[in-house]
Amino acid sequence: MVMKKKRIIAMILAGGQGTRLKELTEDLAKPAVAFGGKYRIIDFTLTNCSNSGIDTVGVLTQYEPRILNNHIGRGSPWDLDRMDGGVTVLQPHTRKNDEKGWYKGTANAIYQNIKFIEEYDPEYVLILSGDHIYKMNYDKMLQFHIQKDADATIGVFKVPLVDAPSFGIMNTKDDMSIYEFEEKPKEPKSDLASMGIYIFNWKLLKKYLDEDEKDPNSSNDFGKNIIPNMLNDGKKMFAYPFKGYWRDVGTIQSFWDAHMDLLSEDNELDLFDKSWRVNTRQGIYTPSYFTKESKIKNTLIDKGCIVEGEIEHSVIFSGVKIGKNSKIIDSIIMADTEIGDNVTIQKAIIANDVKIVDNIVIGDGKKIAVVGEKKIIDSQSLVK
């Protein structure tokens, strides 16, 4: 059955485990990790879709999907609770006489959901990652794709050449047509890194997905298989240069850095930008309360907090309690964490629902200390 035909639909790859985030992803998928005081990482991609006029979105989940599924719900925070389209959570599944099961790679994840895509008979399919922090108008990228008469367009972001070996790199001609793709090259020729954002002409992509699935030697991956195969076949592929804030927060260091970016005077992300409001699903909290003794400097604080101590250059999520004479410096304190009196926390990431008793020191200001959610930190605990 074909529902109302869509010009373009988006498919968000959101099943990643995020092992490099360690304690932060023990019980939830990377796109569900909290960010920026009240958001989750996937909020940025969902908001981009909504603000770009894309009203049909499939979210492909796999690892620890419960919290992510509950957060997305019917999609109302992003105006994606629609009868014809909207947001649909797509989990790996098996069918009768079918042993597909878990997604084997990014391309296989899309392949397993071809029927969902075909319901809307789109001209174009936008493939996205659900675990990056950025604000982007995908419609501008689509117009670029159409103007270039491209078969595929890949979003790229300029990185320092010294960092290029950590990314998939696009080598392009002057007109931004791609002539070579190198996955994490030791000696990069270009500084244009793939953002993991692709626009494909759907009928052509479906053909390549079908062929890739039949190849027993394939990794079933866009970067390793689909993109190189299309290039080898001479398809018209272009790089779309994105200018703005974009961060892969896949490591503890990059996650902490992205939060510290929010506190800089020249913050490019700007969560207070009314023209591109980032939407989320959030609980109901009272306004935050600050005692006479509290001291706050260059800090982002959400609702529902009670602060009796000092906070400097930190991001404090909703519902956090900070006791008397406690000092929080260069840190990220996630929702509903309770910090006792005379506690010092420096350059640390404290996850949700942590209880820290009085007179505890966490972090030395050099290495980033991390405390997983729902932990109790007492005098017997050791946090580095």
Swiss-Prot record:
Catalytic class of the enzyme: transferase
GO biological process, one term: glycogen biosynthetic process
Intrachain disulfide bonds: none
Enzyme Commission no: 2.7.7.27
Record bears the keyword Nucleotide-binding: yes
Pathway entry: Glycan biosynthesis; glycogen biosynthesis
Positions annotated to bind alpha-D-glucose 1-phosphate: Y103, G168, E183, K184, S194
CDD domains: ADP_Glucose_PP, LbH_G1P_AT_C
GO MF assignments: ATP binding; glucose-1-phosphate adenylyltransferase activity
Database matches in InterPro entries: ADP-Glc_PPase, ADP_Glu_pyroP_CS, GlgC_bac, GlmU/GlgC-like_hexapep, NTP_transferase_dom, Nucleotide-diphossugar_trans, Trimer_LpxA-like_sf
Family that this chain belongs to: Belongs to the bacterial/plant glucose-1-phosphate adenylyltransferase family.
Record-linked PANTHER family: GLUCOSE-1-PHOSPHATE ADENYLYLTRANSFERASE, GLUCOSE-1-PHOSPHATE ADENYLYLTRANSFERASE-RELATED
Subunit field text: Homotetramer.
Function of the protein: Involved in the biosynthesis of ADP-glucose, a building block required for the elongation reactions to produce glycogen. Catalyzes the reaction between ATP and alpha-D-glucose 1-phosphate (G1P) to produce pyrophosphate and ADP-Glc.
Protein name: Glucose-1-phosphate adenylyltransferase
